[in-house]
Amino acid sequence: MSNAKERKHAKKMRNQPTNVTLSSGFVADRGVKHHSGGEKPFQAQKQEPHPGTSRQRQTRVNPHSLPDPEVNEQSSSKGMFRKKGGWKAGPEGTSQEIPKYITASTFAQARAAEISAMLKAVTQKSSNSLVFQTLPRHMRRRAMSHNVKRLPRRLQEIAQKEAEKAVHQKKEHSKNKCHKARRCHMNRTLEFNRRQKKNIWLETHIWHAKRFHMVKKWGYCLGERPTVKSHRACYRAMTNRCLLQDLSYYCCLELKGKEEEILKALSGMCNIDTGLTFAAVHCLSGKRQGSLVLYRVNKYPREMLGPVTFIWKSQRTPGDPSESRQLWIWLHPTLKQDILEEIKAACQCVEPIKSAVCIADPLPTPSQEKSQTELPDEKIGKKRKRKDDGENAKPIKKIIGDGTRDPCLPYSWISPTTGIIISDLTMEMNRFRLIGPLSHSILTEAIKAASVHTVGEDTEETPHRWWIETCKKPDSVSLHCRQEAIFELLGGITSPAEIPAGTILGLTVGDPRINLPQKKSKALPNPEKCQDNEKVRQLLLEGVPVECTHSFIWNQDICKSVTENKISDQDLNRMRSELLVPGSQLILGPHESKIPILLIQQPGKVTGEDRLGWGSGWDVLLPKGWGMAFWIPFIYRGVRVGGLKESAVHSQYKRSPNVPGDFPDCPAGMLFAEEQAKNLLEKYKRRPPAKRPNYVKLGTLAPFCCPWEQLTQDWESRVQAYEEPSVASSPNGKESDLRRSEVPCAPMPKKTHQPSDEVGTSIEHPREAEEVMDAGCQESAGPERITDQEASENHVAATGSHLCVLRSRKLLKQLSAWCGPSSEDSRGGRRAPGRGQQGLTREACLSILGHFPRALVWVSLSLLSKGSPEPHTMICVPAKEDFLQLHEDWHYCGPQESKHSDPFRSKILKQKEKKKREKRQKPGRASSDGPAGEEPVAGQEALTLGLWSGPLPRVTLHCSRTLLGFVTQGDFSMAVGCGEALGFVSLTGLLDMLSSQPAAQRGLVLLRPPASLQYRFARIAIEV
């Protein structure tokens, strides 16, 4: 018997009783073998050979061998069955004689044991299948699993018992939870804290995680975009309704001290050329929010740190110089470290103040958690009450530190000389932003001003002592009533853009969870609230009075008390359940929470001439711990929630730079560009070469990044190359243009109507063409050009000329006037200069370039026809023949770049062939080459098919159209109905292009995406 048969036989015999021995066959020519129950021995007879065969044997049983006829009752016998070659008896071809007599008691006892074993085997279930699963496949039905009557009648009773047993087991299983479930239930806060070690969660994280694609950025876990299709819906919300965003990840730096000392310390970090500073009158009084760009001390216009917004706390006694002032500076988390260090150096704050923050105990390790969850003396299935530590219990801090700060490091610094105190208030407040015309209606419906406590009310047991003390002062009550009246007026104003930009309103409100509606509703403006036209007109013209900007949110002690004494959702729900009339208003009286908030108006789009005020709204500042208490009421009033993607779209439609990607002269912007290029390169390499564009053949040198430094350097060297010859040709300064056609060293673009083979040959080797051009320029200029280059390098070294972005409002207004087309009948073919503005002359251009030799200009581009720009799209200068074709046919889309040759393809193919040869070699020969043969292979691994390898050539002259700049944001604009883009161009190249273009077509450029050869016309504009 084989092993498989032995295992099968053992499986069949496992339920047999131990006192029963069943014979499995007889061995021939053996001795006496007793049958169970019999006492007479019997002998196995030898088989006689069957006549006619030599291998077959037949067993013969003699019926006359039984002497007693009473023994005809056979207790056991062997059946005859047919095998190959004849009939055989038993498994081994043997037979046994029937015993002469048996003992009835012994025989019955053996049979009873067999019957009991058989019944036991029948009643005990050996498989895990249910009754309906034992049926043949053709009899099974899907409804049998939940409908017993679908089974055959003989099996319905058994199936009913199985169903009842399953329900009973399910109820018992719910009590016996696994260790993981019990640990998660007991230590959920600790688990959340552990998951926030690297990336901090906002208070609305759980809500976002269920509905948004989450990303880990800047030390936080933030919602990037909704999981549903909502691009157009979010735009409609920003335009006609309301969009809600959580900006609590923004950082806040607080400066305390004398006003004179603070302004003196911060004056070197900003410049009045870029706009308002910290000393602006409306901002200094605390009436408006200001915005500016910070630089390193006395480094303007270079070494920019980033854009910030700021708020001054209003003075109690205006004009008192001895009063201590508070200043809040809000900034993006990527800018925090650089700006904080520079402010500390400017204010001379070097001494850290001892931190008063309660630092939580270290998070338990998995082994410690396991030891905590062990239950040695308790039954697992029982419900257990948590043991209370009583007075020794330590509260678990839900949020430790913030995403940009180590909780163990100090967060306050003081200056011994100036007395200024700098505090890091990041994650100490929540900041929500409502965008859209319905922001007023949603605010006035979701938030109600706090009720004033009267003398007769029982206020002894209330935890809000600060509000009780406030209500005892008539001046404070009067101020609160004025703030409430102004807040109610907002409900009737149709758009936040009607209010002065940056208006601030302080307010103390009640718990918004009490006014929560039964179901979601859409908030609409209420014109009845604007019946007092005089007050509304005064509010729209002058804004909120200075005294109404006061808010208790500036007091950290009050904010801490408000956070600690917040009524939990569980207690509120319990109070609602105890109401006599379900669904009625819950009135808490003096025990209701009072929350100080600050409302800040966001002006939206403030540059340009079209869609002014689009995207305006309100920012709401709240104490920490109250995020979800305000978030849910806003949701119930019909807002749509957006993430980081919606923030980028909002800034794109406002045509304002987005932080940090649109600040190339900022350290955070440079880091962002490096990370973005790395991610795009990895994504590009994941695709096979046949399924990705070959950027070398498309003439795209940098498809994943924007080489700003090389762009500005190339344009600076181009101007310096023909500046001296142009001056020599016109010593009296009669020439007023920087036309490229008049410069001998300036390259002329190739004509698009030339045969394709000639054009392809002309740019087949771009490096050779550049070398020939440079050699020609050197021959024409001679030693004078070299001297000029050395002088310019000395000038750059002396002035510290680095890459910068032009942010002077005066110069931007001048450039904006020059970019637009002008009529032909104006004097000299130029646009008539405005008041205080110069014309587009050579002297004006040189004076600008003298101060900003390597500068970029923020521009907006609008396509004339079809096309949708994308990031890293190239902005190029059109040629003369492009204008001619556009003048003949206004439907002309633009020229097309001819394909370039790929000089790296042969190197990559040789590299692959070399690798194949090395694989085919024997292992001994391959290893004998040693590390000397691996060095060139390692150097060649940097080559990627489709990308330019090594240092980039001159980016401005690589293609048939001169490169001017790059696009950083671009897409189809639903506001305009065509493609729009935002980006930077070289200031030198822009002036050169404007001075050489016809007056009627000034400001036209060409856009070409990285993966396309088609140029498309667009109009450039500078909005100030």
From Swiss-Prot:
Modification Phosphoserine occurs at: S367, S584, S729, S730
Biased composition (Polar residues): 15-24, 53-62
Keywords of this entry: Disease variant, Dwarfism, Nucleus, Phosphoprotein, RNA-binding, tRNA processing
Biased composition (Basic and acidic residues): 387-399
GO biological-process terms attached to the record: tRNA 5'-leader removal; tRNA decay; tRNA processing
Subcellular location: Nucleus, Nucleolus
A molecular-function term among this protein's GO annotations: ribonuclease P activity
UniProt KW tRNA processing keyword: yes
Residue spans of biased composition, Basic residues class: 1-14, 911-923
Entry superkingdom: Eukaryota
Record's keyword annotation contains Ribonucleoprotein: no
Segments for region (Disordered): 1-95, 365-399, 722-762, 773-792, 819-838, 911-936
InterPro entries: Pop1, POP1_C, Pop1_N, POPLD_dom
Gene Ontology CC terms: extracellular space; multimeric ribonuclease P complex; nucleolar ribonuclease P complex; nucleolus; nucleoplasm; ribonuclease MRP complex
Subunit structure as annotated in this protein's UniProt entry: Component of nuclear RNase P and RNase MRP ribonucleoproteins. RNase P consists of a catalytic RNA moiety and 10 different protein chains; POP1, POP4, POP5, POP7, RPP14, RPP21, RPP25, RPP30, RPP38 and RPP40. Within the RNase P complex, POP1, POP7 and RPP25 form the 'finger' subcomplex, POP5, RPP14, RPP40 and homodimeric RPP30 form the 'palm' subcomplex, and RPP21, POP4 and RPP38 form the 'wrist' subcomplex. All subunits of the RNase P complex interact with the catalytic RNA. Several subunits of RNase P are also part of the RNase MRP complex.
Biological role: Component of ribonuclease P, a ribonucleoprotein complex that generates mature tRNA molecules by cleaving their 5'-ends. Also a component of the MRP ribonuclease complex, which cleaves pre-rRNA sequences.
Disease tied to this protein: Anauxetic dysplasia 2: An autosomal recessive spondyloepimetaphyseal dysplasia characterized by severe short stature of prenatal onset, very short adult height (less than 1 meter), hypodontia, midface hypoplasia, and mild intellectual disability.
Name by which UniProt lists this protein: Ribonucleases P/MRP protein subunit POP1
Organism: Homo sapiens (Human)
